[in-house]
A protein has these predicted regions:
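Alpha-helical transmembrane segments and their membrane-interface boundaries
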Residues: 1-112, 116, 120-262, 266-272
């Protein structure tokens, strides 16, 4: 990896750190449920793509509707029937990975997969008092807020140099089919594991099991999984260090948000 940061890299790092912090601070200040949605989605939107245009916005908006419909209709009707819900979710995953593999609607598939996986994880604990409807509304609100934040930050921290569009790799039908089968199998196994065991506090692991599949190949997923494991180790230790430094002030929103901004800005260096 090139150690030299470009001006655009620094601007993107500022957008990622500020987006995560704004989403976190707003959700906490207004006491909104599921703050993980409000913190994660700005990171995804500002981290996966370095630009913001109509095609990206349409995909992101579509990713608010698809997971909500899947959770309310598919899981709402068949969630209590494991032998029915598992193949239905597998078909849903296959459709989304197919969109990603084709490339044109990659972001729609990626955003939908993350939102769907998180909501399915929480929805499986509806008997423990988690309201599915409030969960879906919270997810939609987080996506819309992430768009607003992204708009604002692209104005405040715009690119300083023109970006060269990435070349599109041509894929044959066999390659697409292989990627869809591989990723769908892994995602469905992850879904089954998190539905079977009591892992209500393991939402980050659920999200990670989907995020590592974004390269759409075994080698890429393996490398991504290793990097994510290292990132989790580093991130958790940095968070503990921040808690140790803040001590009794860790419950103060300003200090918690400021420490989050510093840590995300530091870690985003490894992403851009």
């Amino acid at each position: 990896m090139d150690s030299q940061l470009s001006k655009n890299d620094v601007q993107q790092m500022l957008r990622i750190a500020s987006g995560a912090t704004l989403g976190f601070a707003i959700s906490k200040a207004l006491d909104w449920p599921n703050p993980i949605f409000f913190t994660l989605y700005p990171i995804l939107l500002l981290g996966l793509v370095a630009v913001l245009n109509g095609h990206i916005i349409r995909q992101f908006l579509a990713a608010t509707i698809f997971p909500a419909a899947a959770v309310l209709v598919v899981y709402g009707l068949f969630g209590s029937h494991p032998l029915l819900i598992t193949p239905l979710i597998a078909i849903t995953f296959a459709f989304l990975f197919w969109q990603m593999s084709k490339g044109t609607l990659y972001l729609f598939g990626a955003f939908s997969l993350v939102g769907l996986s998180l909501q399915l994880h929480f929805a499986s604990y509806s008997s423990d008092g988690i309201d599915i409807y409030a969960l879906v509304i919270s997810n939609i609100g987080a996506i819309l807020l992430a768009l607003i934040i992204a708009f604002a930050l692209h104005i405040v921290f715009p690119d300083e140099e023109p970006r060269t569009p990435l070349p599109k790799a041509a894929k044959d039908k066999a390659s697409i089919r292989h990627e869809v089968i591989l990723c769908t199998t892994v995602a469905t196994l992850s879904f089954a594991v998190f539905q079977t065991f009591d892992l209500v506090d393991s939402i980050s692991a659920q999200a990670a099991s989907v995020l590592i599949l974004f390269p759409l190949c075994w080698k890429g997923a393996t490398l991504s999984g290793w990097q994510r494991a290292l990132g989790t180790l580093i991130g958790c230790n940095l968070a503990l260090l921040a808690q140790l430094i803040l001590l009794n002030y860790s419950d103060t929103l300003f200090f918690a948000s400021f420490s989050l901004w510093i840590l995300v800005f530091f870690i985003s260096r490894q992403h851009v």
